[in-house]
């Protein structure tokens, strides 16, 4: 039986794409994933993940990567969970070899609902089991998570070469916040790599606009 695993990387950052990856492995090869060191991607260094990438794709019968741009994230019609359902289904439907059973890392607080929503969008029959922290429980999901993280890391490195070092891209990162503030002050807008709908990004924009408006008013009233 063919087993599928699916996960994403980059849901939370204010900068860069969301990457969804799915992997299909024959059930007899699941042990091979464990043997090469596939586990929760968060427990692996970027170098270790990169080394595992080609080994995973060699063991896999099929895999698919979907990259979702910041612009598409900002222009989504629904929630981030709904966008993930849509992109998980897109990745699974794009597979040449269809799995009969799919393990998914649940984005929704209701894991069963998340599974059901994806299952309804499949163009083939498969059973989906969605669980929280599935990437730490199932090697096939760990494998998908590793692929997603490696591709996202590569995308981020490309962006840093073009836009400079913006840190991790997460809103909580002081380096990222400083980069966002400095970029907006200089250009009066954010580049297309930034998720403009993120609260941190909106607050930075509003704060800088308010300060500029105040300076304009101050100059006006200081006129002789």
Swiss-Prot record:
Pfam families assigned: RNase_HII
The enzyme's E.C. designation: 3.1.26.4
Keyword DNA-binding recorded: no
Keyword Iron-sulfur: no
Co-factor: note: Manganese or magnesium. Binds 1 divalent metal ion per monomer in the absence of substrate. May bind a second metal ion after substrate binding.
UniProt entry keywords in alphabetical sequence: Cytoplasm, Endonuclease, Hydrolase, Manganese, Metal-binding, Nuclease
PROSITE patterns: RNASE_H_2 (PS51975)
Subcellular location: Cytoplasm
CDD domains tied to this protein: RNase_HII_archaea_like
Catalytic activity, as annotated: Endonucleolytic cleavage to 5'-phosphomonoester
Chief subcellular location: cytoplasm
GO cellular component, one term: ribonuclease H2 complex
Co-factor(s): Mn(2+); Mg(2+)
Enzyme class label: hydrolase
Biological process annotations from GO: DNA replication, removal of RNA primer; mismatch repair
Binding-site positions, a divalent metal cation: 7-8, 105
Entry GO MF terms: manganese ion binding; RNA binding; RNA-DNA hybrid ribonuclease activity
Domain spans labelled RNase H type-2: 1-210
Function according to Swiss-Prot or TrEMBL: Endonuclease that specifically degrades the RNA of RNA-DNA hybrids.
Family according to the record: Belongs to the RNase HII family.
Name recorded for this polypeptide: Ribonuclease HII
Source species: Pyrococcus furiosus (strain ATCC 43587 / DSM 3638 / JCM 8422 / Vc1)
Biological classification of the source: Archaea, Methanobacteriati, Methanobacteriota, Thermococci, Thermococcales
GN (gene name): rnhB
């Amino acid at each position: 039986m063919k087993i599928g695993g699916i996960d994403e990387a980059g849901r939370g950052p204010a900068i860069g794409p969301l990457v969804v990856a799915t992997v299909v492995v024959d059930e007899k090869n699941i042990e091979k994933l464990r043997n090469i060191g596939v586990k929760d991607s968060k427990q692996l260094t970027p170098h270790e993940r990169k080394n595992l990438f080609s080994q995973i794709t060699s063991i896999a019968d099929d895999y698919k990567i979907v990259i979702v741009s910041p612009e598409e994230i900002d222009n989504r019609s629904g929630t981030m969970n709904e966008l993930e359902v849509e992109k998980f289904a897109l990745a699974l439907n794009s597979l040449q070899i269809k799995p009969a059973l799919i393990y998914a890392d649940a984005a929704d607080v209701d894991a069963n609902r998340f599974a059901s929503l994806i299952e309804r969008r499949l163009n083939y029959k498969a059973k989906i089991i969605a669980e929280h922290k599935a990437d730490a429980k199932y090697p096939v999901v760990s494998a998908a998570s590793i692929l997603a993280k490696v591709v996202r890391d590569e995308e981020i490195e490309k962006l840093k070469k073009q836009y400079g070092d913006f840190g991790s891209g997460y809103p909580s990162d002081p380096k990222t916040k400083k980069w966002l503030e400095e970029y907006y002050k200089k250009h009066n807008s954010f580049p297309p790599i930034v998720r403009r709908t993120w609260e941190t990004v909106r607050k930075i924009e509003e704060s800088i606009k308010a300060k500029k408006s105040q300076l304009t008013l101050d100059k006006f009233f200081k006129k002789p």
